[in-house]
């Protein structure tokens, strides 16, 4: 085990470990988020629209990055994917002729607007991201 000879060296050693832990957390959290988002398709069968699969392919992540005394990663759903497909079956049931991608993703998450699927995937993902981060930091900084 390396011994720091100065506070600056100690800080660098700690930040290197935090960066490694956050890189591990990001990898696990990204996979868990993909699994949760894909689970949306495990329930419900739409009758007035055809699933595009865009939600399931929308998970994006940035690798761990450091700046000063902080390390972070970001996981999000890419809402720039186009789902603006007019659907006359929607208007005949009182819905708008189309929904924007953010509206579709929000309806899928909340289980509203007639969107069929296992809702709550983002809330579950968020909890797993926190847990994955805690687990990774605990693994790297566990007392021995």
What kind of feature is each model-predicted range?
Residues 1-76, 93, 97-144:
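Short, Lys/Arg-rich flexible segments
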Residues 79-93:
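Short, surface-exposed beta-strand/loop "edge" segments at domain boundaries and coil↔beta transitions
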């Amino acid at each position: 085990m390396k011994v720091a000879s100065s506070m600056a060296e100690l800080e660098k050693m700690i930040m290197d470990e935090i960066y490694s832990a956050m890189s591990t957390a990001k990898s696990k959290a990204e996979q868990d988020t993909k699994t949760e988002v894909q689970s949306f398709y495990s329930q419900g069968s739409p009758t007035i629209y055809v699933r595009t699969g865009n939600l399931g392919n929308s998970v994006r992540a940035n690798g761990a990055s450091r700046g000063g005394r902080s390390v972070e990663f970001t996981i999000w759903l890419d809402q720039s994917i186009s789902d603006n497909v007019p659907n006359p079956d929607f208007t005949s049931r009182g819905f708008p002729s189309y929904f924007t991608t953010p509206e579709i993703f929000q309806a899928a998450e909340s289980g509203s607007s007639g969107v069929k699927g296992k809702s709550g995937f983002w809330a579950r993902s968020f909890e797993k991201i926190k847990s994955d981060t805690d687990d990774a930091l605990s693994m790297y900084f566990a007392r021995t």
